[in-house]
């Protein structure tokens, strides 16, 4: 389970999933999860965004589900947003995946597009 980084901002914490072939990706461990939860606990209104790479790719579904589950177990009132590049058809194809079911029931999934220049 690899991730890119955790970024602490004044009003939210960003969890960056690893993109395929990301050479800077790191192994995710319990210390990283603890750091993420500590950072969220310091916010008066905790907000977690999960983005970069593709949080809903086959490689990242388990990790995305794990992070959301553990954050909500410790800080139940956390608002969680998952940003994805997947289109509606691709999202629909995930509906039978148990990790996706958990993710979609515990967070807001926000599709976004990369605009070509």
Language model: regions and residue ranges:
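Classical nucleotidyltransferase
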Residues: 94-117
């Amino acid at each position: 389970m690899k991730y890119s980084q955790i970024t602490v901002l004044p009003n939210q914490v960003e969890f960056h999933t690893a993109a395929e072939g990301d050479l800077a990706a790191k192994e995710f461990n319990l210390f990283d999860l603890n750091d993420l939860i500590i950072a969220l606990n310091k916010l008066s209104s905790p907000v977690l965004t999960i983005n970069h790479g593709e949080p809903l790719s086959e490689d990242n579904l388990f990790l995305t589900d794990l992070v959301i589950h553990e954050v909500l177990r410790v800080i139940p009132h956390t608002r969680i947003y998952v940003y994805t590049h997947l289109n509606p058809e691709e999202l629909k194809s995930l509906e039978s995946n148990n990790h996706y079911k958990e993710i979609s029931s515990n967070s807001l999934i926000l599709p976004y597009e990369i605009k070509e220049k």
